[in-house]
Amino acid sequence: MGCYNGSELQDLGCSSQLLLQPLWDTIRTREAFTRSPIFPVTFSIITYVGFCLPFVVLDVLYPWVPILRRYKIHPDFSPSVKQLLPCLGLTLYQHLVFVFPVTLLHWVRSPALLPQEAPELVQLLSHVLICLLLFDTEIFAWHLLHHKVPWLYRTFHKVHHQNSSSFALATQYMSFWELLSLTFFDVLNVAVLRCHPLTIFTFHVINIWLSVEDHSGYDFPWSTHRLVPFGWYGGVAHHDMHHSQFNCNFAPYFTHWDKMLGTLRSAPLPESLCACGERCVNSRERCAVHLIQKKKQT
């Protein structure tokens, strides 16, 4: 949509578009790389490893930085090198051997042309949110199916559950079929919505970050589930419970599908995070009641 004199609504749209135009112009100066067949795999690997790296550093520092214990989901667990390297190796192997040929085939058939204009900010944000909700729905159905059908679980999903305690690099420790399914849903949604390339980049970055955060093993005050109100978002402790109990919390991000199907289970509050100030292992809701009772006693 070009910017021209018109209604106030059109002017507002142009203003929000102009907010993103400098960023989009910068990306377009590197169009030769962004349109190359190696870009999707390179972008995915760098983004994923880049998001995992801070948590790997925290795990290395954890024994010598006591304050980190307050935010660790499993205070007595820290991944070893023997756990980290196979996870990283499997991610690199699958992206290079399986994902790259698929993206190469797509590039040969339909090389993308980058538009000159950036998307409107409201459009970008709304499309990213819709893509996240669609992805959450699709993975919930896929995930539930692969837990309810024993053959599917043993053949395709069991690999991801080999690490019962979460850590960042275990996020993509999965079978090729599971990685292919996630990639398919990831690409399908942006294609159906005909998203702008900048929206696609943004969605992929956010999606990778949320998945890494869910497996990071750390629950910080700025974690996503603390920023989203009304318990709509599960978060790291929520997903960690799925890894420990298997029969609950199947949605990757949001909680509405698990609520509707009765598979939602409140995440236990780690001892070091308890708001009541004691070494409590109650759920978040019960801990809130515990805290109120403690205030009344004082």
Swiss-Prot record:
Disruption phenotype: Mice do not display any apparent alteration in bile acid synthesis and cholesterol metabolism. Macrophages however display impaired mitochondrial metabolism, due to increased cholesterol that triggers cytosolic mitochondrial DNA release and subsequent activation of the AIM2 inflammasome. It is found in: Endoplasmic reticulum membrane. Residues 128-263 form the Fatty acid hydroxylase domain. The keyword ATP-binding does not apply. This is Cholesterol 25-hydroxylase. A motif (Histidine box-1) lies at residues 142-146. GO terms for biological process: B cell chemotaxis; cholesterol metabolic process; negative regulation of cholesterol metabolic process; negative regulation of fusion of virus membrane with host plasma membrane; response to type I interferon; sterol biosynthetic process. Its main location: endoplasmic reticulum. Its EC number is 1.14.99.38. Catalyzes the formation of 25-hydroxycholesterol from cholesterol, leading to repress cholesterol biosynthetic enzymes. Plays a key role in cell positioning and movement in lymphoid tissues: 25-hydroxycholesterol is an intermediate in biosynthesis of 7-alpha,25-dihydroxycholesterol (7-alpha,25-OHC), an oxysterol that acts as a ligand for the G protein-coupled receptor GPR183/EBI2, a chemotactic receptor for a number of lymphoid cells. It comes from the Eukaryota. The keyword Membrane applies.
